[in-house]
Amino acid sequence: MKYEEIVADLKAGKYAPIYFLSGEESYFLDDIATRIEKNALTEDEKAFNQTILYGNDVSMTTVTDTARRFPMMSQRQVVIVKEAQNIRDFENLLPYIDHLQPTTILVFLYKNKKPDKRKGIFKKLSSSSHCIYFESAKLYDNKIPDWIISYCKDKKYMISLKAAGILAESLGNDLSKVANE
């Protein structure tokens, strides 16, 4: 699925049970995760139903146990796993995929590293109808000005192609840096 399609679904309030977001361009991964984090639950629901975990600190068993909980006074809960590339026992997610908790939105941020698609878990994630499997590649330098124009248009600003080219040239291809400017 493409970034634009995922964002359109999120804006429409359509959430998948699992999001596996990987790749070298962290801007797209962070943006999708932030949209889920900010919009899937109301402020009141977040206290009990939103959990952010870090791959360095947890095992997959902890992640799946958290995802299997039922939401409290809400329709759903959100579990976001940052630095998921550091989880060693990723294979332990397989039983959860087969028996999902339908009220949970589970988000994995697998940054700056490509998953080994030969492993069973990543094959299962990429082929599962319950999972949005998104891989973001770095944008080529010649695509950055067009991305800047599109980004500005989304934010209701106007920018010329020449100005976008100058911005791209001075800031490079780090989209997070470009978006902050």
Model-inferred region functions:
Residues 1-181:
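Conserved beta/loop motifs at nucleotide-recognition and modification sites
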